[in-house]
């Protein structure tokens, strides 16, 4: 699937819920299925700066696509990074760099987060794009 198709799928899923309490529960459930980063990669280098919670993100290239794994010490944040990994993992670096993140606004996520969590979301996206930039430069 393309990034755009995945984003559209996520928007459709979020539109099924009537209120934000249900959406928060769904985000938390998504976090339970997060591809967890190996303990050896839970380093300061892989910590996303600007997040209220501890968030680790690691990316590696396989078959010309970036595979992301992550973890967080907060259940809601774990769900947020799970949404981003679902969107951007198994994609080519150039596709990640070209992708927009308007779907975040479409599902209303940023406006329903505290200011510090919203800043953390921006930091997570920025870190994913940095991985894509680095891997794209290597190719």
Residue ranges, per PLM feature:
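Extended, non-catalytic structural segments that build the interaction scaffolds
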Residues: 68-70
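Short, hydrophobic/aromatic-rich beta-strand segments within well-structured domains
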Residues: 56-58, 83
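N-terminal intrinsically disordered, cationic/polar leader segments
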Residues: 3-54, 61-66, 104-139
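A short interface-forming secondary-structure element
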Residues: 72-74
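Short Cys/His-based metal-binding microdomains
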Residues: 77-79
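Glycine-rich phosphate/pyrophosphate-binding loops
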Residues: 90-107
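Alpha-helical support elements that line or immediately flank enzyme active sites
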Residues: 81-92
């Amino acid at each position: 699937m393309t990034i755009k198709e995945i984003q559209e799928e996520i928007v459709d899923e979020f539109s099924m819920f009537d209120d934000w309490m249900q959406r928060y529960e769904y985000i938390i459930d998504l976090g339970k299925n997060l591809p967890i980063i190996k303990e050896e990669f839970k380093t300061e280098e892989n910590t996303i700066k600007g997040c209220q919670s501890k968030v680790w993100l690691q990316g590696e290239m396989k078959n010309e696509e970036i595979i992301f794994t992550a973890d967080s010490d907060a259940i809601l944040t774990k769900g947020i990074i799970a949404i981003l990994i679902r969107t951007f993992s198994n994609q080519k670096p150039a596709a990640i760099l070209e992708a927009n993140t308007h779907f975040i606004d479409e599902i209303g996520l940023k406006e329903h987060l505290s200011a510090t969590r919203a800043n953390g979301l921006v930091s997570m996206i920025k870190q994913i794009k940095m991985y894509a930039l680095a891997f794209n430069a290597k190719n």
